[in-house]
């Protein structure tokens, strides 16, 4: 899934390089990768370093998780930032050409409320990819967004895949996945490996019914 999302980022970057931008737009190309917390950015950063062609990179700052990108005559440079969603108040005041949200199921509604306006800035391309396993609750933003895209919202697309759709898995890998049914509650296994939505897929199930008084 990360490679697919990276492909969308790369396409947005390449498309932007031929679209003139007003000189007041700083940075000329701006992209974020949003993760639930900063420690979870390590894998994303390592993948970026392996996937972005070196010719595209001007310089990097690993501590801040920022990559300055080489540009073109119409967009002199670009900025790619890995952003943590643990502090929603830090996720504002930017307009984005591309937003990639990873592990969407673990990002709070409050953080999404700050992320969404970054895609409503005039002059920006405002493309986005949201990926993850199903959220636990029907009122979570990722669940609502998937439902809207699945129902045909304009300019949105919904894709669903299971672990069995991964062509790189060996028969041994598949056997291990099947064996995890012995270790996990089936509702959790189906959420993790089949991407099935189930409000009882958490380790504390029936919570909603208990809250409603139906014990």
Where are the regions that the model predicts?
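ATPase catalytic-site recognition across NTP-hydrolyzing enzymes
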Residues: 166-215
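Loop/turn-to-beta-strand initiation segments
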Residues: 76-77, 96-98, 123-130
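Walker B catalytic acidic pair
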Residues: 102-104
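Short, conserved catalytic or adaptor-binding loops enriched in Gly and charged residues
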Residues: 59, 68-75, 146-155, 213-214
